[in-house]
Every structure is written in structure tokens, then in C-alpha cells.
Amino acid sequence: MDAKPQQNPEPPASPLPPEGATAVSPPPPPMRTTLRRAAFGAVAAAVLVAGALVAVPDEEEPAATPAPGPVARAEAAAAAGSPASLSDLTALIGDRQKWVETHPSDAPAWAVLGTAYTEWGSRAADAAYFTRAEKALQRSLAAQPGERGNTQAWAALGALANARHDYVAAKKWGETVRARQPKSWTAYPVLIDAYNGLGDYGAAAKATETFGSLRGGVAALGRTSDMYRGQGWREDALATAQEAADHARTPAEKADALHRLGELAWERGEPAEALAQYEGALRTDRGHLVSLAGRARALAALDRTDEALADYLTVTAKLPDPRYVLELGELYEASGLDGDARTQYGKLRELLGTAKAAGVDESLTEARFEADHGDPEAAVELMEKEWAELRRSAEVADALGWALHRAGRTEEGVQYAERALESGVRNASYAYHLGVIESALGQDGPARGRLEEALRTNPDFSPLAAPLAEEALESLGEPDPGGPAEVR
């Protein structure tokens, strides 16, 4: 049975125990297992950086099959190129902690531990683990510098930077590893995430293609589907995502693939299909909380509000991701429960403060919240800083354009709202924002087209904004008899 993300792999009495503390206490391993684990550290350090436990094939079979157990399953998942379950990831953390306690100069083991901390922190929305990850990776590099071959730790630092949304630093680490090992695939997941975060979609596409040629398998199929989605190639994204699901070999891998199918169905405006995919992911891995959040979103679109609220409350209690807290607050607000909405918005501010203190950049979610529920000028300041620091993704462009409009600077905002859609991504919220901005500028024809696009793409894209999109479209009236307006 998989552990849920809220399960802390450290003793609860001490949020940040010494790195040598043993969270999960496996029985003392036999000598052959101990030696094999030492060798495994060198492999795992190179392959944990993709956000899941993955490994290149090994030409030599281990001398003996280890006894079944969570650490062995995590290692088997790595050998099979699959993500590990959270319970097995927890066990791996405990195992590596115990190992480095008696082998403090084992650089690969520290790199494995650091990357496992990053993975846990990302999947549990617990930024405290990013601090642990950084310390472990520093220990790895102190034992063996990157210039002396420890590129595994460099790549892991890139994955950590991505987890903190520091895409400039992630790009630096990924490109450094690629320059030293151009035929190794381990740098490419780091680079794909970094380039996407910076809005350099051409470089992200090239990195995705190279990753596919070097790595292949379900991980590459998933990345390729994500690339097609970002380009607006829905049919290709769906076909590739389905292929990934069909070839998934472990429950964790299958749940990730089904979640991707759910996200694609949601973006197509098919909440019933999205619900089916999210529930399939949850049947496969009941601790897959991102799919529980997806199910909540789909249930709300299907007017099953009480069930949606229950799911959101479960998710936000176990996975304190600011995005889901914002979604819950907006669902309360759309339901006329303003007091409950304010409670969630207060919780959101607390989470944003905690993330900032831990070095995690959550300014995108913060700007979205401030633009619609707080201080639009503060949202503008946040997004202008992102833009100035070269984080120019479609998400940032959309948020900046909308914040400028909400702050009364509509003429400045339109160029950013347009840029958000230039990547080709089909996003109802982006189209809605641009439509409202164009309407405010008196561009009724383009505005009508954008609002129709938003509602055609996903008529239930937001419990708050979708009804506003319908009202805005109705207020524009019918188009002129000359024909439909051209959508830029």
C-alpha cells in the first residue's frame, strides 16, 4: 500500500533532523545487499533528476535478487525506468540516510538522497525538503566536486532549481551537465523544465526530441505529449499520452499517465472524460493527490459541488499547494460562501509566505490571486519582476497582461495577453483574458471571437470566470452582418 504524500519520511517530532537521522528503519541488510546498494548509488544519482526514479539499462545483472521490500522496489523501479511510489521513495530516503551516516564521503549516495528529498518536496508540496536537498547535494559535491566527475549532483541541483521555480539557475546547471556529457540523457529533463519555465519553447522542443532519442520509453512519451500540448497539437498530445498510458508498467507510472490524460480532457472541455481518467489514476494509486485535485475540478464542472468541495478539502489538507487552495477559495466564492472563501485566501497568503521563506518562487500563483482578489498593482509588480528576470513563459505573459488590465493599464496589458496565446497552447483562461482586454479597448470583433474561443475550448474553465465570460460575450451582442470577426 502506497504512502500518501502527507506522510513525512522524517520523525514528526523534528521537522528538520540531522541528515544522518533514519526515518524508515529497514532491517540490517546482508553484506551482498549492502555492497549492491553502494554500487546502486552511483547509478541512481544520475537518474533521479528527471522527477521520477529512472535508470539506464545495466549490462550486468546483480549477483543476487534482493529480498522484497520498499527499498528494493524503489531500486527495481529505477532499473525499469519507472517512477517510484511515495512509500518506496520514503523508504529510499531512510535507506540512504542510514547509509551516509556510516559512509559520509559517498558522493553518489548523497546525490541520491538530495534528489529524493527534492522529489518528495515537489510531490508533497513541502518546501522544507528543498533545504534538505540542497544540504545533501552540497555534501555530495564536497566529497566529489562536479569538475571531478560528479555531474550527477550538478544535474540534481538543476532539478532542485526547477522545483523552486528558479529556471535561470536550472538552465545553467542543465547546460553545464550537457556540455560535459552531451550523450547522456540526464541533463535533458532539467533543461526541458527550465526552458519551458523561461518561455523558450523552441529550445524546450529540441531538448524533448533529444531526450526521446537518448532515453525513449514512457518517460519520453510523456514529455513529448506535454510538448505537443504546449504547441496546441491536441490530437498528437492525446495519442502520445495514450501510448504512454498503454505502455506504463508500474502503478506509479500508470497513475502519472492517466493523470496526463485527465488534464488533456479537462483542457478540451470534457469534464466527464477528465473525471474518468482522474478516477482511473486514483484507483491505480490512491495517494495520487494531483489526480484528486483534478477530480475536484471536474466534479465542480459537473455541478457536483459538494463532492468537489470534499475532494478539495482533502487535497489541501494533505497537499498544501497554493494553486489548489486558490481553486478551493474560488469555488467557495462562486458558490456564494464568501466567508469560507476568505478563510482559504487567508490560508493561501500563509502558504505563499512559507514558500518565499523557503526560497520557492510562487509569484505566479500569488499574482493570479492578487489580480482577482487582492491588489492588482502588487500583481503587476510581481509579474514585471518575473519578466525582467527573463521568466517569460505563456503563464507569466498571461498573468502580467491580466494584472495590467486589472490595475487600469489595459493598453499596456494587451501585448502580453496576446503573447500568451502565441505559443499555440489552447487555454480557455488565456483566451478569456485577452477577450476581456480587447473588449475594454473597444475591439468588439476580436473580443467576441476570443470569448467564443474560451467557451468553445472549455465552457467550465473556472467556476468564477466562465460565467463572467458568458456575460461579457452577451454584452457584446451579435456580430455585424458582414461576417464573423477575424481572430488575431
Regions found by a protein language model. Give the residues of each.
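Canonical tetratricopeptide repeat
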Residues: V112, A156, V190, R223-T224, ...
